[in-house]
Structure formats: structure tokens, C-alpha cells
A protein has these predicted regions:
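Rossmann-fold NAD(P)-binding glycine/threonine-rich loop
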Residues: 276-290, 303-307
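Glycine-centered, small-residue-biased loops immediately flanking beta-strands
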Residues: 269
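N-terminal Rossmann-fold NAD(P) dinucleotide-binding loop
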Residues: 194-195
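C-terminal hydrophobic helical "lid"/dimerization subdomain
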Residues: 11, 16-19, 213, 259, ...
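Glycine-rich beta-strand-centered segment in the early N-terminal region that forms part
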Residues: 37-53, 66-113, 152-155
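Helix-to-beta-strand junctions that scaffold the AdoMet/dcAdoMet cofactor pocket
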Residues: 265-266
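Adenosine-nucleotide cofactor-binding segment
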Residues: 184-190, 202-260
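NAD(P)H dinucleotide-binding glycine-rich loop of Rossmann-like/cofactor-binding domains
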Residues: 35, 108-188
Length: 352
């Protein structure tokens, strides 16, 4: 373990941990070997030795500073799996050596109305793993212990990382919208998010329709649990599905003909967007007359993440992944950026 002993003016000793990582030094730059130091562990924090970390499209956006708040040098990575190696003095629910997962959020205030109502993911004072701090393309990472979630025994350590961002992103709408096993749900986009959404909804007991412009996705969508497949390469493909779905979950990062999807909703149905479309233009009257709604969500709160992990544990749900050593991180990022990932990419720690 690399560390530096620092002598304070108070004549007290403390350990400054040296972290090995991969970082970009400018927007869109290649990731290079990078070292930084961690100070003292806060009482409510844990330190995690990273074993696996997923690559998410949000990492790519942050890498290029698409959202305008990336700080360089930038260490991506927020789908983290590893073992707890240090525990703050106020942490009582985690143990050394325990496998945990860490996603987008690293800290919340615990005292605002959102936190007190269980929506810690909405905390306006919260901190995110890769916003203003270094992420999981590293051998170590720290977070508030609240956001380090123990892995159930049947959850695969190698493939679990994407559950903590992509997984909870598509699981949260099922909880939010009170989806029942008797509901019929459509999933738009059969990619990194969509394939997990289909698996969750199938195990939930729903009738599931997969929607894609790529007819080659039909067989895999059925393997994931879809009951039906709609190829929207044909502009009129949705017309026979008027008033069909209780929820349409949009996982694709594209702008759609929103009115045509709203028509597929049953009265009281919801168009729920988790893909990063640029805007939604839709006629208002069908929403009013059918009491339909449009909404979206990011990740979920701690309670919902724990529910998701328990659900995965009981139903044997895991993302479909491709594994790269972290030393090949730039090749892995290029693979995702080219749209070749099937369906999530996970980096394996091979730091020397």
C-alpha cells in the first residue's frame, strides 16, 4: 500500500494515501496514468479498494465536458465494485473486507426535506462521485458510507457495477410509477439501459414490449424477457398500438415523435424518460383528456437501490457485460463511443 506520512504543525501524524488512477487533462483527452493523494478519512466515510468499474455514457459526457462542469484532471468512473478497506469512526453498518457497490452519488446532507423523506438522490447539497471529485478509474475511492451498498451473496461481483447507475436508473421508474405485474410496459431502446429494463420488468411479471429501430435486436430482446417487439424503422409501426401501454420507458438518447408514443399510452399512462433526449415537444390535449403524463428520473435513493439489489439477488438478474482491463481503458471508451458495447462495459483493475 502506497502512502506518505505527513507531519502536521500540531505534531500529530496522519497518513496521506496515494491513489493510482487514469485521468484526462483536457476535454476529450486520452486517459493517462495519474496519481493523487487522499487526506484523512472522514468519520462518516468508507474507503474502497476498486476491483471493477463500469463505463457509462455519463463518463463520456463528463470526459468531453458536454455539461460544462467537468474539472480537470478528470478521473471518470461511477459504477464501482470493491472491498471496504477503511471505515470512518461513525460508520457501524459496514465491515472491513465487505464487497460494496457505489454509483453516481457519493454524499448527501441527510437533513434536508428530500433526505428526510427518503429521496437522498434529490439532495440539492449532495455530491456526486465524478463531479468535482475523482471517480472509480482508480485503485481506491471514498464515499459517504450511506452510498456504499453491500452486495448480496448471489450478485455477481464482476458484472454488478452497472447496476449502480444504469440499473437503478431503469429500476427506479418501476417503483416510482407503482408498476404492477398486470401492467403492460414498453421499453424504447435495447441498449445498456434498455436490456436491464426488460430483465427487471419481465421478472416483475409485466407484459413487456421492446421497441427498437434495429430489427436485429428482436432475438436478444426476447432472450432478455420481452414478450413482443416493435420495429419502428417503419414510421407507422406504432399505429396499431393505440391505448396499449401503462408505461412507456424511453431509454434511448434520441429525440422521438413524442405524440405517437403518447398515443400508445392507456388513459392514466406515463411516458417516462431516462435517456438524455434534448427536448420533448408534444401536444397537450391528449395528456389532459387521457390524464396521461410525461416525466423522468435519474438514479434512486438508498432504499430503492437496496430493493433493486435484493430483487436481483432473488431473480438472478445481472447486466450483460464486456470486460476490459483498466490498462486498456482508452480502447474500452472508444468501443462504447462507437456504439459497439454489448451491453455494458466493465473495467477490471489491473494496476500494478
Amino acid at each position: 500500500m502506497d502512502y506518505i506520512i505527513t507531519y502536521l504543525y500540531t505534531h500529530e501524524l496522519y497518513i496521506v494515501m496515494k491513489v493510482q488512477a487514469f485521468a484526462a487533462h483536457q476535454p476529450g483527452g486520452k486517459l493517462e496514468n495519474f496519481e493523487y493523494e487522499l487526506g484523512s478519512l472522514k468519520p462518516d466515510e468508507v474507503e474502497i479498494d476498486v476491483e471493477y468499474c463500469g463505463i457509462c455514457h455519463s463518463d463520456l459526457h463528463m470526459l468531453k465536458n458536454d455539461w460544462g462542469f467537468t474539472r480537470y484532471p478528470f478521473v471518470p468512473g461511477h459504477e464501482i465494485i470493491g472491498k471496504v478497506t477503511d471505515i470512518g469512526s461513525a460508520v457501524t453498518h459496514l465491515q472491513l473486507g465487505q464487497y460494496v457497490g457505489l454509483g453516481w452519488r457519493a454524499r448527501s446532507c441527510l437533513v434536508c426535506d428530500q433526505c428526510l423523506s427518503g429521496h437522498h438522490n434529490r439532495c440539492l447539497k449532495g455530491q456526486d462521485v465524478i463531479v468535482g471529485r475523482h471517480g472509480g478509474y482508480a485503485n481506491k475511492v471514498r464515499c459517504q458510507a450511506l452510498w456504499a451498498f453491500p452486495l448480496p451473496k448471489n450478485v455477481n461481483v464482476k458484472s454488478a457495477g452497472p447496476l449502480f447507475c444504469g440499473g437503478i436508473t431503469v429500476f427506479n421508474p418501476i417503483i416510482q410509477n407503482n408498476i404492477k405485474s398486470t401492467d403492460h410496459v414498453a421499453v424504447v431502446g435495447i441498449g445498456g439501459l434498455g436490456h436491464m429494463a426488460i430483465k427487471f420488468l419481465d421478472s416483475w411479471g409485466c407484459e413487456v414490449t421492446a421497441i427498437s429501430t434495429n430489427p436485429e435486436k428482436e432475438r436478444e430482446a426476447q432472450e432478455f424477457g420481452a414478450d413482443h417487439f416493435i420495429n419502428t424503422k417503419n414510421a407507422d409501426a406504432l399505429k396499431p398500438y393505440s391505448n396499449r401501454f401503462d408505461m412507456v420507458m424511453v431509454t434511448a438518447n434520441v429525440d422521438l415523435n413524442w405524440d405517437s408514443y403518447i398515443k400508445t399510452l392507456r388513459p392514466g399512462g406515463r411516458l417516462h424518460i431516462v435517456g438524455a433526449a434534448s427536448e420533448v415537444n408534444a401536444a397537450i390535449f391528449p395528456l389532459i383528456s387521457g390524464e396521461k403524463s410525461i416525466g423522468g428520473s435519474p438514479i434512486g435513493g438508498p432504499a430503492d437501490i437496496l430493493k433493486m439489489l435484493d430483487f436481483c439477488n432473488r431473480h438472478g438478474i445481472e447486466p450483460v457485460i464486456e470486460e476490459f482491463p483498466i490498462s486498456d481503458v482508452n480502447e474500452a471508451i472508444a468501443h462504447l463511443a462507437a456504439g459497439k458495447a454489448r451491453y455494458r462495459i466493465v473495467l477490471r483493475n489491473d494496476f500494478k
